[in-house]
From Swiss-Prot:
This is ECF RNA polymerase sigma factor SigR. PROSITE patterns: SIGMA70_ECF (PS01063). Sigma factors are initiation factors that promote the attachment of RNA polymerase to specific initiation sites and are then released. Extracytoplasmic function (ECF) sigma factors are held in an inactive form by an anti-sigma factor (RsrA) until released. Responds to thiol-oxidative stress, involved in regulation of about 30 genes and operons, including the thioredoxin system (trxB-trxA, trxC), ribosomal protein L31, RNA polymerase-binding protein RbpA and mycothiol (MSH) biosynthetic (mshA) and recycling genes (mca). Disruption phenotype: Increased sensitivity to redox-cycling compounds menadione and plumbagin, and to diamide. Loss of expression of mycothiol biosynthetic and recycling genes. The gene is sigR.
Length: 227
């Protein structure tokens, strides 16, 4: 594996990526390793879930997480304690996926455990600060995991990653912009379009199961387009 670049390690955006905070020579390799194990490995399961959403293949997800943590460890001296470690790790994960795994992805293994955990669904339902509406929250509460999975996998990749980071992981717009390396306006656009597509599919699933009255989604869309 080649040297970690500033882009991969997340050194271009946000104070969490600045090589500051610990004096030169103030931390030994053993101390840094212990700090990495203590702080970074806490997010391992969440990182794997995110990698699985991106790659849609368990083997690729494992490889992506392994490479992400190798890069994170190599550049951990650049991370400033007390800032957002989770966002810093997700930036490395997302950049590694975009730069590597997107180009050489294997075919998805649909039968594998591509699951959204119950706690993730609950967080997605309760994450209302950026505008989730009743259709999503109702569907996430009542629909089978397989339906939510299928809907998320069906929306385009850039939308899927933005929606995942916002509505499952709970990142704010600015954090998502830093993670994805895009302007906040682009993040907002991707979230709006991704959520709209996701809402339409979830409403279809919910109508098929009698959870949403027939025509409810269409009437809301008509109101929105007429305003």
């Amino acid at each position: 594996m080649g040297p970690v670049t500033g882009t991969d390690a997340g050194t271009e955006h946000g104070q969490a990526e600045q090589p500051e905070g610990r004096g030169t020579g103030a931390e030994s390799t053993a101390e840094r390793s212990a700090r990495f194990e203590r702080d970074a490995l806490e997010f391992l399961d969440q990182m794997y879930s995110a990698a699985l959403r991106m790659t849609r293949n368990p083997a690729d997800a494992e490889d992506l997480v392994q490479e992400t943590y190798a890069k994170a460890y190599a550049s951990f001296h650049q991370f400033r304690e007390g800032t957002n470690l989770k966002a810093w790790l997700y930036r490395i994960l997302t950049n590694t996926f975009i730069n590597s795994y997107r180009k050489k992805q294997r075919e998805p293994q649909r039968s594998a455990a591509e699951e959204i955990e119950d706690w993730q669904l609950a967080r997605a339902e309760s994450h209302m600060s950026t505008g989730l509406r009743s259709a999503e929250s109702q569907a996430l509460d009542h629909l089978p995991d397989s339906d939510v999975k299928q809907a998320l996998q069906a929306i385009p990749e850039e939308f899927r990653i933005a929606v995942y980071l916002a509505d499952v992981e709970g990142f704010a717009y600015k954090e998502i912009a830093d993670i994805m390396g895009t302007p906040i306006g682009t993040v907002m656009s991707r979230l709006h379009r991704g959520r709209r597509q996701l809402r339409g599919m979830l409403e279809d699933y919910a109508r098929d199961r009698g959870l949403v009255p027939a025509g409810a989604g269409e009437s809301n869309e008509a109101k929105g387009s007429g305003s």
